[in-house]
């Protein structure tokens, strides 16, 4: 990190967050263009990403984002469900335009389409799943930033942020760090203070699993007799009698 001024070097907490979120864990394979971002290979075959390179690219990407005068001209996209919440929160804090879910083909190239837009910068969570917007951005000369794993192909990617883009915690942390750095550069928050927003706000949550977890916890906490009473108690049925003649 000697190429950075002391103020721009990552704090120990930032490195610990990356390790806790497994940002450094790559895949079993490595693309030839991603070899320079790897540190070593573990005995189990997984490549380890060099977090110093990750931090450098976060710094570079944040400065590119700040250079865009109108933040609404920045499009942030994630077709991957694990990155959709992070994309929405990131766009909300920096003022960008978020596209979560399926990307409509022709959004950047088909002018007769109702959703046609001309962004000045594109940010994607996965170059593989977000291949369509990356391809369209290359047609119309839109610079791109992407979260890239060791197996990611960098075709159409101008700035690759090496990280684990397969885990929800790692994706959330990358967008959180990028948003915080943008706010630092804009002067929205002082660099010597801690950002009040927690990483947890960016982490994907499965809304379908929450009711099931609550139900399971309630059943486990309730006494067995109470559960049996709830499940098997039946209202008494009045006896039928023939009407008097």
UniProtKB/Swiss-Prot annotation:
Domain of life, source organism: Eukaryota
CDD domains: RPS2
One GO MF term: structural constituent of ribosome
Subcellular location: Cytoplasm
Gene3D superfamilies: Glucose-6-phosphate isomerase like protein, domain 1 (3.40.50.10490)
Record SUPFAM superfamilies: Ribosomal protein S2 (SSF52313)
Alphabetic keyword roster: Cytoplasm, Ribonucleoprotein, Ribosomal protein
One example of a Gene Ontology biological process annotation: cytoplasmic translation
Any Pfam family matching the protein: Ribosomal_S2
Keyword Calcium: no
Keyword set includes Cytoplasm: yes
Cellular component terms (Gene Ontology): cytosolic small ribosomal subunit; extracellular matrix; phagocytic vesicle
Similarity comment: family membership: Belongs to the universal ribosomal protein uS2 family.
Function: Required for the assembly and/or stability of the 40S ribosomal subunit. Required for the processing of the 20S rRNA-precursor to mature 18S rRNA in a late step of the maturation of 40S ribosomal subunits.
HAMAP family from the UniProt entry: Ribosomal_S2_euk (MF_03015)
Subunit note: Component of the small ribosomal subunit. Mature ribosomes consist of a small (40S) and a large (60S) subunit. The 40S subunit contains about 33 different proteins and 1 molecule of RNA (18S). The 60S subunit contains about 49 different proteins and 3 molecules of RNA (25S, 5.8S and 5S). Interacts with ribosomal protein S21.
Protein name: Small ribosomal subunit protein uS2
